[in-house]
Each structure stands twice: as C-alpha cells, then as structure tokens.
Amino acid sequence: IGKAHGGVSVSGGVGERTREGNXLYMEMKESKVINEQNISESKVALVYGQMNEPPGARMRVGLTALTMAEYFRDVNKQDVLLFIDNIFRFVQAGSEVSALLGRMPSAVGYQPTLGTEMGSLQERITSTKEGSITSIQAVYVPADDLTDPAPATTSAHLDATTVLSRGLAAKGIYPAVDPLDSTSTMLQPWIVGEEHYDTAQGVKQTLQRYKELQDIIAILGLDELSEEDRLTVARARKIERFLSQPFFVAEVFTGSPGKYVRLSETIKGFQMILSGELDXLPEQ
C-alpha cells in the first residue's frame, strides 16, 4: 500500500497482547515503515487497546483506528489499509460493557446490541471520491463454530472471508486456507471472467466430493471406492497441495524460499489437474 500506491496503513489492536504489539512496532521500525526521526514519512499508524485495559477502552480502539483511517482518506486524500486484530475482541469488549450496564444478554450471552455495534464500525469502512479504506480483519471463531453470533455478524459485512483449517495445518499444508468455507463476492463471471469462474467452481466441486468420501475412506479404505471416485480423491489431494504456497515472511520459520505465482499460471495449473493431464504425477 505504502510503496506501490502511496497510501498508508492503520493497525487497530483490539485486546492485543502487549508483547505482540511491541513486536509489531519494533518490526515496523526495522523495516523503515515507521520513521521516528521524521514521523511525516511514516506509512503506518498503530493503535492499541491492550488485554489488561478496561472493556470501554478496548471497545473504542477499533473505532479510533477507523477515525484515523477516515482522516487519511478525507483530509490527506490517501488510500488506506485498515487492519483490525481481533474483531472478536471488539464484540467481547462490547459484551462486557453491556453486562456492566445491566442489559439482558441475548443469544449465547452476547449483548442485545451486537448487530448495531458491529454496524457502527463496519458501515464506516467505505470509499469516497477522495480515497478508499480497505479493511482486513482477523476474526477469532469460538470453538470453530462459524454460526456463532460474533463471527456470523462480522462475516455479514465482509466482501470476502478466508477461513483457516486446523485439518490442513495438521497435514503441513500452508497457508491452511479452507476453500470450501472461504467465500468471496468478487468470484462472479462478469468480474473475474468465465475461465477463472468455471475453474474455481470445478475445484470446489472436486474438493466437496472428496470431503463427502472421507468418511467412507476412513471406514472401508480407498480400495472400496469406484474408479471414478478414486480419481476424484487423487485430483483433490493434488489440488490441496497445489493451493499451498511458500511465504516470503515465513522463510525464517520454514526454510523454504518464498514464491510469487501469476494468477494466469495458477488457473492453468488447476485446469490441468481437473482435466486429468497430471494424473500420472504423484501427489507431492
């Protein structure tokens, strides 16, 4: 955002751990994104409401970060990346405030004003003729239940959701993104094109069929499947591994150099897997 588009980033740490906030601050200084000698040259603003602070302070941090983003957009006329970590802590802080005010809790103990409070934050994240605000929000999902009121209310406001899977992480596949639970309103043929859309739907259908077959495989084994289903399983496993990608930021931890892959190459690769061109190759 800062280098390619001349924009700025605002990070709102809602209920952030002190050590994590400090580690991010030091990393921003080392990468010269924050310049303490000349603050006007900085490309990042950090706002924290730490875990040990009262719920009122934690609840206002997300709104404070958003107000700063609006300033950069409306006054400085810049494009802004707003990162909120974690939006669930915003809901949690609101629940604590609601309890202190003596309000009757609603479903699963959340505050009765959950939808209104979430809307007061999310509906301000918008673009104008002067600039734009693009928001990336980390969402904690209690007990991995996507129907929990907190993540469900949040996702209703988001254009796209990227769901991380413990199962994929256990297989050592990173990023552990679950393509079946993840969604995007941008995945439409008139936006991404017919080829991209059709390929994505084919990938999802193959993975969905593999998911349906997993119970049968666990009980009876792979040999009991039909030839067609065995082929589907083999292709789905290739797709799972093809969806992984070494990150530049994770080089220190994995020892694997990061790689960029062009979108056109990715689509072509999926088409080759789905068509059976790569059936002769091993999963790895």
UniProtKB/Swiss-Prot annotation:
Its EC number is 7.1.2.2. Its main location: plastid. Pfam families: ATP-synt_ab, ATP-synt_VA_C. It comes from the Eukaryota. One of its GO terms (cellular component) is chloroplast thylakoid membrane. One of its GO terms (molecular function) is proton-transporting ATP synthase activity, rotational mechanism. It is a peripheral membrane protein. It is found in: Plastid, Chloroplast thylakoid membrane. The keyword Cell cycle does not apply. Keywords: ATP synthesis, ATP-binding, CF(1), Chloroplast, Hydrogen ion transport, Ion transport, Membrane, Nucleotide-binding, Plastid, Thylakoid, Translocase, Transport. CDD domains: ATP-synt_F1_beta_C (cd18110). Belongs to the ATPase alpha/beta chains family. F-type ATPases have 2 components, CF(1) - the catalytic core - and CF(0) - the membrane proton channel. CF(1) has five subunits: alpha(3), beta(3), gamma(1), delta(1), epsilon(1). CF(0) has four main subunits: a(1), b(1), b'(1) and c(9-12). This is ATP synthase subunit beta, chloroplastic. The gene is atpB.
